[in-house]
């Protein structure tokens, strides 16, 4: 009897395809069991007691392995049930897997899988809550408004947690906490929003906010990037900077504190005295401009036989400058008081303004000899040197008498215009009263680089503790160039305003010097290299940087009287300076919210550095006095103390400003007042009637014979009564004591002394 080996389809030609199906299934079960154990450990869930790799269960699964192929198979193989034979049918393997699934407790594993995400959420929630509580106890919760990502990253590296403002990730903040936990991963936005939701009811201990925002969480004294002060000494506005410039003379100290600032006038209000002071300054500047024009030109270029300007114009200008020198040398309050000019002086001033304008703008000629003009030029130089030594800011003036008009509370070059005509200036400020314009002398002789105007952006940090006010200056800065070459013949903003917000709207002029940067910015190293190439004196930059510090210290000191000294308050300022021809800095303005965006490769490098170093000074230094402060340098420090009462609270004096000559509101009459008024009216009526009867009665009815009225008095009384029919008697008759009985006098006294 021959036996036939039946080879299942699919097994021919490849004996090792299913080499050991039992070991294959066992390996799969081991892998699944290991994954289940790992998942249970992560979710803190106990592993099912029945193990899938139990040898006993596996033996029971495969004890009847030979029978899974069917009875016919065993007969065909000669009754052999050996497992060494690898000739199996596909149905036998499928039945084996089904048998294994049916006999093992897989339903327990399936039912426990939905609880794993919930357990993971609980674990993540507990971890986040622990971090939140720890951050609150260590005062490490912060809120940042705006796109100051450098500040966020710097604080997060220090272990701080962010309390998100409502505008940041608004869509994610509208989701539930469970939905956020499903997608939360380390460092992603979902995790940040989950932590912010948990931290929402805790105060923030570091707040970076805008200037106009309300100060929140004041009770915990957070680090806040805002220092509040009154608007009259808020140097981050034009109006406040003017107020500080008026006060800084009381704090001036050579080498420490001093302010270089173009002279200014507030023409935005109805201050007539300041308007008159500006007109006087404008006329004085016109006189100096004319003398500068004469000094800068040769005498032969200024004269002509057909000239229309006489020497009296030069005499008037010299007289003006002489008067200025006398006032500067012997300055007193009487000299400072502006007196209204006489009619003759008004005519003389107007004549001078017309003729000097013809010379400066139309190149009109003088009708004098060359020798006389040379003498005028010598005197002009003499008096100009005297006044410039007394007033260094006059060295910045030229011969154009230009003034720059700035809105009092605007920034980024908005609303700024340049004018030279007095009428145009006064008309512009009158038409824009709501903008509170500041009129400032334009710097006509600045330091130029390759015939182009520039300014310097310097950073200052102001910090306040419970006992000190610290002024920090940054040792790095950058230059901003105009896109056009400098000229006084064209007054467009693209030439004279170097703000990046203004210059980015214009293209660079094609014939501009090729050595200037295309992005209109230089780093400090590039500027130092330029100074070395141009042969500037040694120490020029040190002189400039020390001037920066002196200006900023003077501004802060002048504003301290109106500054709220709150512990942990700080503020970062962007300060704009120009340089004169001798590398002396001139303060232009101070911005409380400087632009820190990476607009160019220069700002992309320096702005993040400034923010990182700011966090070092504000956050790290109070905890560690030896902590690094980056490039911030302590320029000045002021110690202060607040007088406190017995209860430990600062002493305060609260009051209300008294207003004189104000019509007080009429009070509502009480019942008692109305009753008194009614009684007084009745008394007044009865008294008037009695007086009229006494006046009209003949003298014989009066008991006292000495009280007879003379004929002359009778005539005057009758005349008075006839002209004022049924009116009150004349004052003469009323004041005659003899005709008033005691009852009448009592009634009159009651009438004029009772409360109204």
Swiss-Prot record:
Pfam families: TTL (PF03133). GO terms for molecular function: ATP binding; protein-glycine ligase activity; protein-glycine ligase activity, elongating; protein-glycine ligase activity, initiating. Its EC number is 6.3.2.-. The keyword Transmembrane does not apply. Residues 104-123, 709-736 are annotated as: Disordered. ATP binds at residues 440-443, 453, 455. It comes from the Eukaryota. The keyword Electron transport does not apply. Residues 272-629 form the TTL domain. Keywords: ATP-binding, Cytoplasm, Cytoskeleton, Differentiation, Ligase, Microtubule, Nucleotide-binding, Nucleus, Spermatogenesis. Gene3D superfamilies: ATP-grasp fold, B domain. Essential glycylase which modifies both tubulin and non-tubulin proteins, generating side chains of glycine on the gamma-carboxyl groups of specific glutamate residues of target proteins. Monoglycylates alpha-tubulin by adding a single glycine chain to generate monoglycine side chains, but is not involved in elongation step to generate polyglycine side chains on alpha-tubulin. Has the ability to both mono- and polyglycylate non-tubulin proteins such as up (Troponin T). Required for early steps of spermatogenesis. This is Tubulin glycylase 3B.
